Amino acid sequence: MTTAALASEVAAQEIETKQDRLNALMDEHGWSAVLFSRHENIAWITAGRVEARVALGTETAVCSLLLTRQGRRFYIAPENEGPRLAAEEFSGLGFEPLLYPWTDNTTDVLAHKAGGPEIGADTAMPGFYHHNFTPLRAPLLSAEVDRLRQVAAAVTASTVRVLRTFTPGITEDEMAARISADLLTRHITPSVLLMGADERIFHYKHAVPRAGVLKNYGMLNLCARQHGLVISITRFIHFGPLPAVLAANFEKAARINAELLHATRAGATSADLYAVAAKGYAAAGVPDEIAKHHQGGACGYLERDWVALPDGTERVAPTQAFAWNPSLQGAKAEDTVLLRDGAIEILTATPDLPVIEISIGGKIYRSAGVYLP
C-alpha cells in the first residue's frame, strides 16, 4: 500500500468514528442529514484533509458537506470548483460530488434532494435546523492529537526563529510579514497577527500591526492553522534590562496561567475556570484586570471554541486543547496546551527562551518569560 493510500485509509477510519458521533446527534434531533458549510466543521469531519478556503477571511467554504444518516457523504459546490475539489481535496475520502452552475447556487435544493427534509446545519438557512456543532468536536481522537502536536511544533519553531530576528527599528508590519512568510512557506496559514511595539503593548490587548517601531519591547502574538487545527502562542522580546515592574507582571501572569492549567480538568465548566482566573487577578492585587480582556479557553479547529465566562456552561472534555491568555499591564502568558489522561502537556513550549516556573499542588507549570537577546 502506498503512503498516500495508507493516509486515505487512516483518514477514512477517523471519518467513520466521527460519523458515529453525527449519527447519534441526528437520532437525538430526528434529522435525516447534516449540512456543514463552516470551515472548522469541514476540517473536523474530513480528518483535516480538506481546505476549502478561497477567501481567507470567510467563515464558510466554497463547498458544503452533506452527511446522511444512511452513511452517504456528498460535497456540494459550484461546477467551477469541482475539478480541484475532486483532485486535491476529496480524493479517497468517499464523498460524492453534487455540483451546480456558479450562476445559480442551489445548495439547499441539492441538500434536501439527497438528504431528506429534516437537516441540521451549521449556518442559518431557511428550511434547515441551525445548530452549534462545537461540542461534537471534543474529545479529540488520537490521530487529531498527533496532528495537533505536529502543527504546534512547527508553529513554535517558526515563532522562536522569527522572534530572534527582531532588532530595534523593525516595524510592526515587518514583524507580521516575517512570521507570515516563515509560516506560509511551511504550508501553515496565520489567522491572527498581533504585533506590538513598546507602549502599544501596554495600551492595547489586541495590538494589530500599525505604525509602531520597536525600540525596546516587542510582542509576537499569533494564531496559525494547518490541517484545520489552530495553534496560539505569544512571545516577547526586550532590548536592555527588563524593568522590575514588567518582570513582576510576567510573574503574576504566569501564576494565573498556572492556576488555570491546574484547574483545566475534565468536567470543569467555563464558569469554574473564569472564577479561577478572577481569583488569581484578585490575589495579584489587580482584580479589575480580568475585565480588560477574555482569558482564553478551549480551542482546536478554531482560535477559541469557547472562552471562560462568569456564567459559561461548557465543560472540559477528557482530551481537549486549550489556549489560556491571562494578561496584565504589558505582560501576557499564552500557549496552546493539551489535556489528556488528566495531565497538561504544553504543546508550544519554548525551553530555549526564558521560562517562569510556578508550583501548584506539587506540579510545576511553565510559562514563557521575556527573551532578552
PLM feature spans:
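Active-site neighborhoods and metal-handling regions in enzymes and metal-associated proteins
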Residues: M1-P373
